[in-house]
Regions:
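Auxiliary Fe-S-binding modules of radical SAM enzymes
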Residues: 1-5, 192-309
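N-terminal [4Fe-4S]-dependent radical SAM core
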Residues: 2-58
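Core AdoMet radical
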Residues: 35, 51-66, 70, 74-99, ...
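Conserved strand-turn element in the central/C-terminal portion of the radical SAM core barrel
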Residues: 89-91, 144-145, 157-183, 201-216, ...
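Alpha-helix-loop-beta-strand connector modules within alpha/beta enzyme cores
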Residues: 92-116, 149-170, 214-237, 281-296
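Catalytic cores of alpha/beta
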Residues: 119-129, 176-192, 244-254
């Protein structure tokens, strides 16, 4: 379907109205701290951490005090949820220690989310006990072909998280010009079957020098149509619809969840994404507000549960 067409605009309008109705016209900004950089042997071709891409040749983790400071800053700036992100090969027990320390420092009702590699039931329970409310996890486009992870392994992690009482957010990503309609439909239906607290669609960011960079990027206009279709397909049982990176067109088309980022970022060759691709909480809020959304204040409404720990 042409991006500039009456039909495309009708789809985006319908998606916007659905999100407005399910979320009460409200939007959220979540904030992620990437706690480490490392050459990752899972070798997701689209990722700046992939060992094959030779962007980060060293392993380095932030000191816990810096992670806590960054999380508290995000909390103070009005982020509705705080995410800790680590590479897939980051030691799980060390990640749990980070999580416990951050959980203790944050307000009791602040939502804490893990964005990490795969884990089993024992790991899911440990995350819950450490104070995490949920996880971000996606079965990415090209999973098993352009990544070193089998799709079933990703699904096993989602199931383990749900059994442990962790809520799951996900997304159809990373969308590139090479992806077919059939691939997008497959991942959209899979997203719906995951029964997430939020869904959406995000484009692949072309990282210079990587194998996929030559394929280019999907335009924000095309992504607005894709995220609108995902929104409608997932249905009214999911109130929040995300896109990344934050942009005005997506917000108009029904995206009501953006991320601010600092620290490491798998779409960024810079070690500190706040100096390059990362958005601030204030900028995300500004884009959403300009698109006519009312901002949620306080803890995330998408992740409506407490945590043990």
């Amino acid at each position: 379907m042409p991006v500039i067409s009456e039909e495309a605009y009708a789809i985006q309008y319908a998606a916007r109205k659905m999100t407005e109705e399910t979320a009460g016209g409200r939007a959220e900004v979540h904030a992620q701290v990437g706690i480490n950089v490392a050459p990752c042997l899972q070798n997701c071709v689209f990722c700046s951490f992939a060992a094959r891409n030779a962007i980060f040749r060293h392993s380095k983790a932030m000191p816990p005090e810096e992670v806590i400071e960054r999380c508290l800053a995000f909390e103070g700036q009005g982020a509705n949820a705080i995410y800790l992100m680590a590479t897939a090969n980051f030691p799980f027990e060390e990640f749990l220690r980070f999580g416990r320390q951050v959980r203790e420092a944050l307000q009791p009702d602040t939502v804490l989310i893990a964005n990490i590699g795969d884990f089993d039931d024992e790991g899911a329970i440990a995350l819950r006990k450490a104070g995490f409310n949920g996880i971000y996890h996606a079965i990415r486009l090209g999973e098993g072909a352009v990544t070193g992870i089998k799709p079933e392994r990703r699904l096993q992690t989602v199931r383990a998280a749900r059994r442990a009482g962790l809520l799951v957010g996900t997304c159809v990503e990373p969308v590139g010009p090479e992806h077919t309609l059939d691939e997008l439909v497959e991942k959209t239906l899979l997203t719906r079957e995951m029964r997430p607290v939020f869904s959406g669609a995000a484009r692949r960011i072309a990282i210079p020098g990587t194998d996929l960079a030559g394929l280019g990027m999907v335009s924000e206009a095309r992504m607005a149509l894709i995220l609108a279709v995902v929104r409608l397909a997932v249905g009214r049982g999911v109130s929040f619809n995300c896109t990344h990176e934050p942009n005005d067109i997506g917000a108009m088309a029904g995206a009501n969840l953006f991320w601010a980022e600092n620290g490491a970022n798998p779409r960024d060759p810079e070690e500190k994404t706040e100096n390059n691709r990362g958005y601030t909480v204030a900028k995300c809020r500004e884009i959403l507000r300009e698109a006519g959304w009312e901002l949620v204040t306080g803890p995330s409404r998408a992740f409506q549960t407490g945590c043990s720990g």
